[in-house]
A protein has these predicted regions:
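Compositionally biased intrinsically disordered regions enriched in Thr/Gly
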Residues: 23-301
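Sec-dependent signal peptide recognition
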Residues: 5-14
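C-terminal motif of bacterial Sec signal peptides marking the signal peptidase cleavage site
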Residues: 18-21
């Protein structure tokens, strides 16, 4: 009888250990750390002078494109389409990375040539009109002409911010100048499911009403970043509409929290850098949907 009891206890212990091992294995597989996605980079720099004359205005376009190139576990084609679409636009999403980069560069040069040709045509009309005006009238009117067309500049690149736990967060930075004194820089943030390239949205990770709940946290973060004590002081630094600021869907996720980027012109003047607001998961647990990716990441802390 004692032998039977010992064997029974032994079997129960083995069963319990097997059950625990199975549970641990399941948890590890469904929420593994590494995505096992490899990335490659395409770099293209092209300069085009009007009429092939190096003394004339030109366009200069640079692309640095980081994209998923290989994986034994996920659908790389879906990931590539997502990266191409979000970096260059929906028009290019069915093209492979090399085709998309070359197509984007060639389209930029073509657009520049068309703009230059349109300017040349309008300049002829304006010159004919100006022939009827005095020099003073020309100088004071909107018909004053530049001797030559403008030069255009554009740089576009993307960077991987987070690549773990079934998520890829990446940021696209685009800078352009079309003849003005100031270059315009924008940041576009994307979070995608690493298994299929499907976007992760705010509605996927937050409970309803999250936007108003996050408002105060965003304002508090801006006050701390810029050393201001009041919203009025933020406005003195170049911010506006801060009391109405809300989450803008332009976010990144990592293993610590959510990062919002507010581009110049959204709530701040163009002379300021684009504000970035980091909100730790630990401060927004009640706002996170149960079993969402953000909720799971929060409990890794």
């Amino acid at each position: 009888m004692e032998e039977i009891k010992v064997k029974t206890i032994h079997l129960l212990l083995v069963s319990a250990l097997m059950f625990t091992a199975c549970n641990n294995t399941s948890r590890s597989t469904s929420f593994q750390v590494e995505n096992n996605v490899e990335f490659d980079t395409i770099r293209v720099h092209k300069k085009y002078h009007l009429e092939g004359d190096t003394n004339k205005p030109y366009c200069d376009v640079q692309v640095v494109f980081v994209y998923p190139s290989a994986s034994l576990e996920v659908d790389v084609d879906s990931l590539q389409r997502s990266f191409v679409r979000n970096t260059f636009g929906i028009h290019y999403q069915e093209q492979n990375p090399t085709q998309a980069v070359n197509g984007y560069v060639n389209s930029f040069v073509e657009s520049y040539s068309k703009d230059a040709a349109a300017y040349k045509e309008s300049a002829i009309d304006i010159q004919e009109f100006n022939a009827l005006l005095s020099e003073e009238e020309i100088a004071d009117s909107e018909h004053a002409l530049r001797d030559e067309f403008y030069s255009y500049f554009e740089t576009i690149s993307d960077s991987i911010v987070f690549n773990q736990y079934g998520l890829i967060s990446f940021q696209v930075k685009q800078s352009n100048n079309k003849g003005g004194a100031t270059s315009y820089v924008t940041y576009r943030n994307y979070v995608i499911n690493a298994n299929n390239g499907i976007p992760v949205t705010e509605n996927d990770i937050f409970n309803p009403g999250y936007d108003m709940a996050l408002q105060g946290m965003i304002v508090t973060s801006l006050l701390e970043q810029y050393g201001a004590k009041t919203i009025s002081e933020l406005e003195d630094l170049g911010f506006f509409g801060v009391q109405e600021i809300l989450p803008n869907s332009n976010f990144l996720l990592n293993d610590k929290g959510i990062i919002y980027t507010f581009n110049k012109g959204e709530y701040s003047a163009y002379q300021l850098d684009a504000p970035q607001v980091f909100i730790p998961y630990t401060t927004i647990l009640s706002l996170l949907r149960d079993n969402s990716i953000a909720h799971k990441l929060a409990y890794l802390q």
